[in-house]
Amino acid sequence: MDEGIPHLQERQLLEHRDFIGLDYSSLYMCKPKRSMKRDDTKDTYKLPHRLIEKKRRDRINECIAQLKDLLPEHLKLTTLGHLEKAVVLELTLKHLKALTALTEQQHQKIIALQNGERSLKSPIQSDLDAFHSGFQTCAKEVLQYLSRFESWTPREPRCVQLINHLHAVATQFLPTPQLLTQQVPLSKGTGAPSAAGSAAAPCLERAGQKLEPLAYCVPVIQRTQPSAELAAENDTDTDSGYGGEAEARPDREKGKGAGASRVTIKQEPPGEDSPAPKRMKLDSRGGGSGGGPGGGAAAAAAALLGPDPAAAAALLRPDAALLSSLVAFGGGGGAPFPQPAAAAAPFCLPFCFLSPSAAAAYVQPFLDKSGLEKYLYPAAAAAPFPLLYPGIPAPAAAAAAAAAAAAAAAAFPCLSSVLSPPPEKAGAAAATLLPHEVAPLGAPHPQHPHGRTHLPFAGPREPGNPESSAQEDPSQPGKEAP
């Protein structure tokens, strides 16, 4: 039987020297099982790690949101805008510290009561603490009810007003004066300060009656500085810089001895109106005396215009407004000569009150001298002439002409010799220009060369002569006469 079974070949034992020089490439392909598993799950490992990190962040955000909801409302109102995570953590830490201090204080009270010692505070103080704690609990419950059922948010104006009112009422009974100072910024704009003042008044009276004042009564601090000095000080709360500092300093220095000062505040002109110009000095040339030309002009203007200083200043003002002010005075409430309302007529002075010889030097580039004498001034007049209208007596017109001549002499000293002609020429000019109703009885009245006594500016215009119309129009000075 044994012969029919083939015998297995005997295993040949290999020694170490048989392996030398052989290359076993298949051995390099073999890897350990642990490293093979790590390589295969390398891509699948990142996904669970991301999920774990997301879950961790979600848990952190959820805890911060719960802390935000558990924070008291007065801590939430200390910040503006959205509460960040860091702000929520800071407020939570602050609240925990306050609770820890309160817990430690209550623990000390309990120990003191167990040892049989007297209370650290007076009975009134203990009652106030109990009342304050109950008030906070009730206020918190009210806010939670409004937030849940009425959908109120802490940022709504009505919720802020309610919180301020509750806080103001609670601060009236606070035990320490340090917490009383928090009432001012929170209860501004409500009726809490007046209520606090009314509640503190009887408290101060009771403290004055007793020898030992109460701890929750705070005396009112009053300013000892006078109200006038307070009004004169610069207001540093305003940043406009328009408090009238330059005007207030001289008044304050003058009023220190008398005990009163007046503040002058700079004001803007109303609307778009420009401020009124400053008046010129009336005694610039005459020195206030009637000896010089300026003094004579001032006396003549004062005699003419009476109590109207503005018209007198306009007469003596040596600028471009002099001529425009001399063209027409009257016609209204400021008429120099009071007349009845029915007979009131405008009193006009001529525009060209200079003699032709003096005016020709100024208007020579625009008008010819002959044209000037022909159309603007009669040839016989060598002095300023008055213009008379019905309703104005001759003495008044003569006084007005004298005032105009004096004003012109004061404004233009170089022309004083021209404006003061000899008496015979002045008499001839007056006889030439005076109408028959006001002329002297013995003086002859010659016919006016142009036939118009009330309009010295208008001359005869020929319909077919364009040159005469160009010369007699003083509004076109650019056209020269041939």
Curated annotation (Swiss-Prot):
Cross-linked residues, Glycyl lysine isopeptide (Lys-Gly) (interchain with G-Cter in SUMO2): K31, K121, K210, K266
Gene Ontology terms for molecular function: bHLH transcription factor binding; DNA-binding transcription factor activity, RNA polymerase II-specific; DNA-binding transcription repressor activity, RNA polymerase II-specific; E-box binding; histone deacetylase binding; MRF binding; protein heterodimerization activity; protein homodimerization activity
Keywords: Biological rhythms, DNA-binding, Isopeptide bond, Nucleus, Repressor, Transcription, Transcription regulation, Ubl conjugation
Domain Orange: from-to ranges: 131-166
Entry-linked InterPro entries: bHLH_dom, HES_HEY, HLH_DNA-bd_sf, Orange_dom
Compositional bias annotation for Basic and acidic residues: 246-256
Effect of P384R: Affects sleep duration; abolishes inhibition of CLOCK-BMAL1 and NPAS2/BMAL1 transactivation activities
Span list, region Disordered: 228-298, 438-482
Annotated segments matching region Necessary for interaction with RXRA and repressor activity towards RXRA: 67-71
Tissue expression pattern: Highly expressed in skeletal muscle and brain, moderately expressed in pancreas and heart, weakly expressed in placenta, lung, liver and kidney.
Gene Ontology CC: one annotated term: chromatin
Biological role stated in the UniProt entry: Transcriptional repressor involved in the regulation of the circadian rhythm by negatively regulating the activity of the clock genes and clock-controlled genes. Acts as the negative limb of a novel autoregulatory feedback loop (DEC loop) which differs from the one formed by the PER and CRY transcriptional repressors (PER/CRY loop). Both these loops are interlocked as it represses the expression of PER1 and in turn is repressed by PER1/2 and CRY1/2.
Protein name as catalogued: Class E basic helix-loop-helix protein 41
Organism: Homo sapiens (Human)
